[in-house]
Each structure stands twice: as structure tokens, then as C-alpha cells.
């Protein structure tokens, strides 16, 4: 990414005890030194509120991908996996889309997927995943919570995992938005 690209964030998603939750922070960073916004909303409800999507990367690029993904959801009657695969194929195959600098996590009540511009659609083995600059911190915290604090709800796990990432990663803030299914 260029030095003037708006980027950096953390998105975390988990399925736990029959519930699903996705959390994202609110920080938008310009380059490596300037916080441009602290209250961005990077987790959205799509397809009549039945699908959650979160992005890490360039904001403008992510909005383009949200629109394309929602179109694919409509086209395939809400089939998350099919819509994600079709988006990844289009993203990888289109010369202009290939330039987009973002990653998505998409989820419904049954599945979590990471979608990237390299054509990858990845389902995590353990019903939790994180992307973005603080993704490894959130993922580590989430795995620990799932193993040792399984009494927490999916929403609580998502919030606390993002909170840990915000405490460590300078590109992640603690203005956390959590959406649940």
C-alpha cells in the first residue's frame, strides 16, 4: 500500500454455542503516522441482516467489495459460500478489481469465510478468524477465550478479543462495534 492509502484495522469473527459475532475497531489510518478517523464502521449487515461482513484494508476498495458481494448474495439467494467463491473469482480475474487492497470476513449463522483478492476463500478450522493489522493478536486472544472461558457468549468473545488487539496494535483502537447473528 502506498504511504497515503487509508488502511489498518482489525476484524474478528467467531461462532460459539450456536451464535455468531463479528467485531471491528473504528480506526482509519493515513499512512503510518496519522489517525484520520476513530469511529469508522467496518462491520456491516448484508442480505436482509442474515450475513455479516467486515473489511480490513483500503476503505474505498472495501466499499466496492461490499457492493459486489451483496450483489453476489442476491444472485445466489443468500448462499454465502457460493457468493464468496464467485466474488473471489471475479476479484482475481478482473484487471481493475485485482488492484483493490482489502480483505473480507463474511459470515452467516452456519459459516465464516475469509475472502481475498488472490482468489482465496478460506473457512477456519476452529470457528474463529481475524484479519488486519491486529488480527494475530485478536485471533490469539479469541482462541484462549474459546478454550478457557467457554462460558462467554460469542458477542463477549468478539469484544474482548478486539480489546486485546487494541491494547497491543497501534493501528487498532478500542472503539469496537460488534454485530451478532
From Swiss-Prot:
Na(+) binds at residues 166, 169, 172. One of its GO terms (biological process) is proteolysis involved in protein catabolic process. Allosterically activated by HslU binding. The active site is at residue 9. Gene3D superfamilies: Glutamine Phosphoribosylpyrophosphate, subunit 1, domain 1 (3.60.20.10). HAMAP family: HslV. GO terms for molecular function: metal ion binding; threonine-type endopeptidase activity. It is found in: Cytoplasm. This is ATP-dependent protease subunit HslV. It catalyses: ATP-dependent cleavage of peptide bonds with broad specificity. The gene is hslV. One of its GO terms (cellular component) is HslUV protease complex. It is an enzyme of class 3 (hydrolase). Keywords: Allosteric enzyme, Cytoplasm, Hydrolase, Metal-binding, Protease, Sodium, Threonine protease. Pfam families: Proteasome. Its EC number is 3.4.25.2. It comes from the Bacteria. A double ring-shaped homohexamer of HslV is capped on each side by a ring-shaped HslU homohexamer. The assembly of the HslU/HslV complex is dependent on binding of ATP. Belongs to the peptidase T1B family. HslV subfamily. InterPro entries: ATP-dep_Prtase_HsIV_su (IPR022281), Ntn_hydrolases_N (IPR029055), Proteasome_sua/b (IPR001353), Proteasome_suB-type (IPR023333). Protease subunit of a proteasome-like degradation complex believed to be a general protein degrading machinery. The keyword Transmembrane helix does not apply.
